[in-house]
């Protein structure tokens, strides 16, 4: 896989109450990823960027909600999330990552 493509796959970590709960309970980390990212690409990107070993990747597509803006109807953007499980003894410290 192209290293340049792998650098663009992961957009941001998801920092929500639910993501924190999942991280503590299942030792998984949630990331927002590009819409056309595949599981092998996500795994390779996490291993390249954070220097950790990935055990598994679970992916979900969240549809954007329909919202009203005054008299106009709009739509929030859809997003793709990846829950990445790290191998035993591995962890990512976001404070150290540059």
Curated annotation (Swiss-Prot):
Similarity annotation: Belongs to the universal ribosomal protein uL23 family.
Function: One of the early assembly proteins it binds 23S rRNA. One of the proteins that surrounds the polypeptide exit tunnel on the outside of the ribosome. Forms the main docking site for trigger factor binding to the ribosome.
Record-annotated disulphide pairs: none
Gene Ontology, cellular component aspect: ribonucleoprotein complex; ribosome
GO molecular function: rRNA binding; structural constituent of ribosome
GO biological process: translation
Keywords: Ribonucleoprotein, Ribosomal protein, RNA-binding, rRNA-binding
Source organism superkingdom: Bacteria
UniProt entry tagged with the keyword Ribosomal protein: yes
Subunit structure: Part of the 50S ribosomal subunit. Contacts protein L29, and trigger factor when it is bound to the ribosome.
Pfam families per the UniProt record, alphabetical: Ribosomal_L23
Listed NCBIfam families: PRK05738.1-3, PRK05738.2-4
Keyword Transport: no
Annotated protein name in UniProt: Large ribosomal subunit protein uL23
């Amino acid at each position: 896989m192209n290293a340049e493509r792998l650098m663009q796959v992961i957009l941001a970590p998801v920092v929500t109450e639910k993501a924190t709960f999942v991280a503590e309970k299942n030792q998984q980390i949630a990331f927002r990823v590009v819409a056309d990212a595949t599981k092998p690409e996500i795994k390779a990107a996490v291993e390249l960027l954070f220097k950790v070993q990935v055990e598994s990747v679970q992916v979900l597509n969240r549809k954007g909600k329909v919202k009203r803006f005054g008299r106009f109807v709009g739509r929030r953007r859809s997003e793709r999330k990846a829950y990445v499980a790290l191998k035993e003894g591995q962890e990512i410290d976001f404070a150290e990552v540059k």
